[in-house]
Amino acid sequence: AARFAQTAQYNYTRMLDRGDTLTAGMMLWEGIKEAMKLQHYIEGRYPLHDKWLLRSMQESEAGQRAAELLQEIGAGGAAQETAMAVEKLAGFFSGELYREGFISDTDSYLDAHSEELIFKASMGAKSRDALAEEIAKLEFEAFDKVKNEGGRASCQNDWGTFSIMRKSQYLTWNRGMLQQYLYDFYREYHRGHNLIEEKYGRMMESTAPEKYEEIKSHFPELTAEKKAIIEQIVGLQVGWMEEFSCRYPSLAGNARYIHTYEDTAEDTSYETYLRGELGTYSDKMLELYGRYIVEYAQNGKNPAYDTMENSVKMYGYDSVEDAEQKIAQWEAE
């Protein structure tokens, strides 16, 4: 993507502006070759020898569309028309890269996505367990820096519990979600934006509304559309948590209250926590999370159960049912 951007997108017009038509032509044809290779990479295929690139591209529907756009670039039209054709192809690629989960937005200048592409490529060989572990460690580092009005919270020193709670959730996610969230969190953290701090701040809209009014300007504003999506997701997950609570009351009794109306200044409900967390997600991450929730709904499964299953196994139980039975016995003694 960066090579296509540096040759056809950037240096082609730059060389033309200098009056160097020979180098401009070289940049354009280099860019065409890089575009053919990029289409192969997007499809998860290794590009063949240069002489077979075009034919190989045309084996897929997306490749055929890219080839048509490349034909426009190579048609030998006026420089302005060629530059417009290059931008049209760049827009096509940004859409394909976004759709496949490689990038978080559709900025058509492809070099703008280099950092994200390199970061996600470096995560490619890691297992889901390793990705979940890396996210939890980065979050705990960020959590350590959160300043509480009442002083440092004891849970900020409890890596064991924090690790289990976070990984239990992340191990229900797919690789695309894990890579996206890890990239988002890493990027924001190294820009000085602590998503854990933002999450707890957003929760205060319910638990400490007066304080929230003082701090809300520090958080990115959520669009009406994003708020609506979050509320749809929250509604589904609260329903699933209610269902889980009915079936496994002993386990649920050791977790958070479920509903926002149960919030106090000291206790934050599952609903409020979830709403705060989703409010920190990037547009791309929320899109992926929404698909994940839809998939659960379509399959008639419950993410609350799967998350709790991961959690109790990390605590040494065989299953949710085993944990429920043993905890109920202890409570009865």
Regions found by a protein language model. Name each.
Residues 170-186, 229-236, 278-281, 285-294:
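Short, structured motif recognition centered on aromatic/hydrophobic residues
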Residues 18-37, 49-52, 239-248, 271, ...:
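A contiguous, surface-oriented mixed alpha/beta subdomain in the mid-to-C-terminal portion of proteins
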